[in-house]
Structures are given as C-alpha cells and as structure tokens.
Amino acid sequence: MKLHDSLAENKSIRLQAEAETWQDAVKIGVDLLVAADVVEPRYYQAILDAVEQHGPYFVLAPGLAMPHGRPEEGVKKTGFALVTLKKPLEFNHEDNDPVDILITMAAVDANTHQEVGIMQIVNLFEDEENFDRLRACRTEQEVLDLIDRTNAAA
C-alpha cells in the first residue's frame, strides 16, 4: 500500500489539528485509521503501552513521529494516517522534540512495516524541505500533491 493511495482512499489526513498532549495527538491519527476500518480501537492503547515500556520509540526525526503498534495489536490491513498539529507537542524525546507531524502506520506484518512503511516515510523526508512544505499544506490535495512530487523525483 502506497502512502499516497492509503491517505487518499482512507481519507486519513488531518491538518492543523489541535491536541493538548502527545497522547491526544496519537489518538487523532489512530481514530482516522479506525474510521477507515484499517485498525481496531485497541490499537491506540497498544501504542500507549509500548511507549510506557520503550519510551517514545516512534519519534524518528526533529518534529516527526510515526506512531505504530504491532500487527497482532488490532491491525486489519496496512494503512497510514497523516496529522499535522497547530501547536508542536513534547513527546519526551531528548533529541527530536517538539513534534508537529505524525504519520500513524498500521502494517499487517513486519516485512510490510519495514519495506513499505518506513521506506516511504524516509523517501518523503529525505528532502528536509519537505518538513516545511508539509507544515504549509492546508488541504488534503496539497499533501497528496507533495507526496506525488516527492515520488516522481525519487
């Protein structure tokens, strides 16, 4: 499942969202995936439990988090949700706080998680200017166009 296709088909983009805590921010992304029938509601608690156990493992770069759980924790099919926050939040990551871009990922197996999910995110943000381009997006179509341009350049 391609990032662009998943976001478009699942209508799982939320821009300039308001959240008080990192948990609220994660829930916005998971709720988009629940609404699209990509994950079960329990996926949210699984992510919170993993953070309690391992720390903020999904904060990948300055400003960027990729919340995700394990396939057996309620994943029905592979999919993505993209959330930008109006106000960046602390995720308690010593290097990469605060976070204002979240790409929530659900993968049906570890191979899909590594090869499909993470590689597409790395590809999108290989050009560091895409962080600011994404923050500037105000419509779902602008996000999808940015992803298309990035894929065309790759």
Curated annotation (Swiss-Prot):
GO terms for cellular component: cytoplasm. Keywords: Cytoplasm, Kinase, Phosphoprotein, Phosphotransferase system, Transferase, Transport. Induction: Induced by L-ascorbate. Repressed by UlaR. It is found in: Cytoplasm. InterPro entries: Ascorbate-PTS_EIIA_comp, PTrfase/Anion_transptr, PTS_EIIA_type-2_dom. Its main location: cytoplasm. GO terms for molecular function: kinase activity. Pfam families: PTS_EIIA_2 (PF00359). The active site is at H68. The modification Phosphohistidine is found at H68. It comes from the Bacteria. One of its GO terms (biological process) is phosphoenolpyruvate-dependent sugar phosphotransferase system. Residues 6-150 form the PTS EIIA type-2 domain. The PTS EIIA type-2 domain is phosphorylated by phospho-HPr on a histidyl residue. Then, it transfers the phosphoryl group to the PTS EIIB type-2 domain. The phosphoenolpyruvate-dependent sugar phosphotransferase system (sugar PTS), a major carbohydrate active transport system, catalyzes the phosphorylation of incoming sugar substrates concomitantly with their translocation across the cell membrane. The enzyme II UlaABC PTS system is involved in ascorbate transport. NCBIfam families: PRK10372.1. This is Ascorbate-specific PTS system EIIA component. It comes from Shigella flexneri.
